[in-house]
Amino acid sequence: MNALIDNRVLALAGVVQALQQVRQIAETGQSETSAVRTAINSVLRIDAESPEAVYGRIRDLTQGLQLLHDYFGNQLRDQLLPRLALAVLQLERRFIRDTSIVAAVSAGITQAAHQVEQTGDSAHPEVLSTLGALYANTISHLRPRIIVQGNPHYLGQAGVVAEIRAMLLAALRSAVLWRQLNGNLLDFMLAKRAMAAATERALR
């Protein structure tokens, strides 16, 4: 049981780490390249079914795990982040049921993977632009629509918007993994203590 919860926590860490980048980019116009690479790499590993296969090293999820640790300890300062995470988890249910959108996203990810091979960098602006456009043309049509708040100066820049959308796609990818691991919204009420313990284990 512990192993399953440990894996769910890693998937959730992937969700919130990508969304933390969304929040940061929207407010400052800047992202953390290492976190962006971890997020985009998880998207490209579309057929992977375990956290290790999706994210690689657990330490690459340290930021997300720390955010979860703060959330479970009632110490999270950003009150918008949990709302965004809940919206993404709800959106995942709509996404996975729409086979046409799933197919379109899969094809778009394959195109982005070719770009990564050409540029040698999963955080390259061309890759982020492709994935951002993919999100806009597919997932953004689903409901609930994810609303991102931030600095209007940055939210008016095409490159910033593309990177935000690419990070939202990454958050959704982690939400899909979370559901594959039998994650349920009831976890936040009925298994909160167990998830908090799993977060602490992952951070050791």
From Swiss-Prot:
GO CC terms of this entry: cytoplasm; plasma membrane
Pfam families found in the cross-reference section: DUF489
Keywords assigned: Cell inner membrane, Cell membrane, Cytoplasm, Membrane
- Location of the protein in the cell: Cytoplasm; Cell inner membrane
Tell me the membrane topology, using the record's own terms.
Peripheral membrane protein
- Protein family: Belongs to the HflD family.
Q: Which organism is it from?
A: Xylella fastidiosa (strain 9a5c)
Q: Does the keyword Nucleus apply?
A: no
Q: Supply the name of the protein.
A: High frequency lysogenization protein HflD homolog
Tagged with keyword Cell cycle: no
What InterPro entries does the entry give? HflD (IPR007451), HflD-like_sf (IPR035932)
